[in-house]
Amino acid sequence: MLRRLVQQWGVAVFLLSYSVPSCGRSVEELGRRLKRAVSEHQLLHDKGKSIQDLRRRFFLHHLIAEIHTAEIRATSEVSPNSKPAPNTKNHPVRFGSDDEGRYLTQETNKVETYKEQPLKTPGKKKKGKPGKRKEQEKKKRRTRSAWLNSGVAESGLEGDHPYDISATSLELNLRRH
């Protein structure tokens, strides 16, 4: 009995492990067939999309052609001597009443016509006015140069001098913060 069971299991394993051709094709060929079916499916999908896109283009082209010709048809149907429809009223056209000028902003009341400004050249830069900070720096430089020229630096009284730059700059820094 054990021997018979081993034989059956051996045959089953052999059949499962060996690729048996089905309908004359091996298992590998069946796999290729499935792959080919997927690529064919993709091809058909792409064809369908391109056909749908082509139909949409034709539809839009036809629609645009109708829009362009509709204006021509509308103007050609109206004869030059035709009367207006009875429900329309002929109101006189008024251009600018006297009340309009009172309520308009200054921008719209300008009498001057618009003048185009000349294009600015990128090379030219506008000189700005020197700021307060620059003026202070210039004063410091002047006092420093005057201080060095007067010979106070060589006298050894640097810390006791009322115009000591290091003391004034320290005081300025403390005042700022």
Swiss-Prot record:
Residues 122-132 have a biased composition (Basic residues). InterPro entries: PTH-rel, PTH/PTH-rel. Transmembrane segments: none annotated. It comes from the Eukaryota. There are several secretory forms, including osteostatin, arising from endoproteolytic cleavage of the initial translation product. Each of these secretory forms is believed to have one or more of its own receptors that mediates the normal paracrine, autocrine and endocrine actions. It holds the Pfam family Parathyroid. Residues 57-68 are annotated as: Important for receptor binding. Residues 109-118 have a biased composition (Basic and acidic residues). GO terms for molecular function: hormone activity; peptide hormone receptor binding. A motif (Nuclear localization signal) lies at residues 108-129. One of its GO terms (biological process) is osteoblast development. Its main location: secreted. It is found in: Secreted; Cytoplasm; Nucleus. SMART domains: PTH. Residues 25-34 form a propeptide. Residues 1-24 form the signal peptide. Neuroendocrine peptide which is a critical regulator of cellular and organ growth, development, migration, differentiation and survival and of epithelial calcium ion transport. Acts by binding to its receptor, PTH1R, activating G protein-coupled receptor signaling. Regulates endochondral bone development and epithelial-mesenchymal interactions during the formation of the mammary glands and teeth. Required for skeletal homeostasis. Promotes mammary mesenchyme differentiation and bud outgrowth by modulating mesenchymal cell responsiveness to BMPs. PTHrP interacts with PTH1R (via N-terminal extracellular domain). This is Parathyroid hormone-related protein. It comes from Canis lupus familiaris (Dog).
